[in-house]
Structures are given as structure tokens and as C-alpha cells.
Amino acid sequence: MDYKKIDYEKIYEGIIKIDPKIRLVTICDSSGRVMYSQHREGIKNLLTPEESKESLELAVNSWKIRTKLAPKIGKGKYVLAEYEKIKRITMPLGGDDDDHHLLYITTEVQADHSNIIRRVSEITIRKLLL
């Protein structure tokens, strides 16, 4: 798969439409380099830019650790962290076949995270390539 042809904005648009309670969609590569990141219109970031970067780095590093365990426990499908003010979903962009990109999605606490995870998983890279 040629990742240079990925239309990250189109992926964002597809994901943000899934649920109005999605606050933020960030797509990064496996090293944590942000390929695309945008809040839903009208949503205020709760973290400073430095805190946002640190949170993403922690999520990426945690994902790398889980990937090391994959031969024994299987590949990670997603991670859900629920805080008092938001939920954070981290998952591979292209499902089990994509070890190169991570989705980092934040939602309102009331969001139906199971539905969001299921619907995001249904979005395939093939549909989103140029």
C-alpha cells in the first residue's frame, strides 16, 4: 500500500461525521509525527499545545510497547482511556494491517465509544486513497 497517497483530510472528514461527540481526530505515523490533526469546529482544546504533544507521544509509546507483545497476545485493536472530561481512543488507522499509522481520537464522555470504534474500523484505507 502506498501511504504517500493517503488523503488525511478525507479520512478526518469521514471520521468526524461518525458522531457529533467526536472532538478531535489526529493521524500520526508510528514515530508520532502528526500527519493531520483537527478539532471539530467550535471545540476548544482542553490542553496546551505542549500537553497535547506529550499526550500523543505517550499514546504512541504505549502502542509501541503493546506491539512488542503482539506475538504472544495478538495485535492491538484499540485502546480506550476514559477521563472525567473526555474519552481517548487510540487505534491503527487501517486496522490490523496498518502498523504505520495511528488514529488518536478524543470524544465527549457521553459518546458511544463502542459505536465510534466499530464505525471507524469499517472505514478502509482503500476507500480513502486518492
Residue ranges and their predicted role:
Residues 1-130:
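Non-catalytic interaction/Regulatory regions outside core domains
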